Regions:
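N-terminal active-site beta-alpha-beta segment that forms phosphate/nucleotide-binding
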Residues: 1-37, 165, 169-186, 191-197
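Short, acidic/turn-prone active-site loops that include or flank metal/cofactor-
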Residues: 2-3, 28-29, 54, 101-106
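Alpha-helix initiation and capping sites
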Residues: 4, 8, 43, 77-80, ...
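Short, charged, surface-exposed secondary-structure boundary motifs
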Residues: 8, 32-35, 59, 107-112
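S-adenosyl-L-methionine/SAH cofactor-binding core of RNA-modifying enzymes
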Residues: 19-88, 92
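C-terminal folded domains that constitute the principal catalytic or ligand-binding module
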Residues: 72, 80-197
Length: 197
């Protein structure tokens, strides 16, 4: 699920790399017949990659669950505020079982400011899920998921180089690395925004 503002986000090239993936663009998918058909496909066991108290953690007991059908994982591609809105408006997702993981590292998306520690880009999240499914013995990709991170890292490097170039860019301030940035005070007021439904 890609927010319409994220057409150049990491979800787009992740979709181009991953086989058997589909992309749906919008905000509210309740009336999207193709999306609803995929969501309710009886041939798959469907999970939504989204945090929550009732989310199953890949690292904690998911292997024992052993899905009887092939897995289908829905991923929301957008900023955290956009993801929240998409989740709220698409009511058919509210009863979809959730899947989550424990971030094992800081995001490598240096060009973009992450709101909180542990927040990852779409491609990094999908990479973590694939690795977790491999570790659980549910998937056997032969480390092909490393291609995702290779493309991602090269993209980030290129974006950083472009950001450093002087000229009429969209940035109001010079580019700085994540460790040099100050966290906005606004984020502390938005914690419920991320942790709620």
């Amino acid at each position: 699920m890609e927010h319409k503002k994220e057409k150049v986000g990491t979800g787009r090239f992740t979709h181009l790399i991953l086989k058997n993936s589909r992309i749906f663009v919008g905000i509210n998918f309740d009336q999207d017949k193709d999306f609803q058909s995929a969501l309710c496909d009886p041939d798959y066991e469907t999970f939504l990659l989204y945090p929550g108290d009732d989310a199953l953690e890949i690292e904690n007991g998911f292997a024992e669950r052993r899905p009887s059908r092939p897995l289908q994982i829905i991923v929301i591609d957008g900023t955290w505020p956009c993801a929240k809105k998409m989740m709220k408006l698409t009511t058919t997702l509210h009863e979809t079982p959730r899947l989550s993981f424990t971030p094992g590292k800081t995001s490598e998306f240096k060009i973009k400011h992450q709101p909180m520690e542990g927040c990852l880009s779409t491609v990094e999240s999908i990479y973590q899920v694939i690795r977790g499914l491999n570790a659980a013995g549910i998937e056997k990709t032969g480390a092909k998921e490393e291609n995702l991170m290779e493309v991602f890292r090269k993209t980030v490097e290129q974006q950083i180089e472009c950001a450093k170039e002087p000229g009429d860019g969209y940035r109001k301030k010079p580019f700085s690395l994540p460790e040099e940035r100050k966290t906005s005070k606004k984020w502390s007021k938005r914690l419920l925004f991320f942790r709620g439904l």
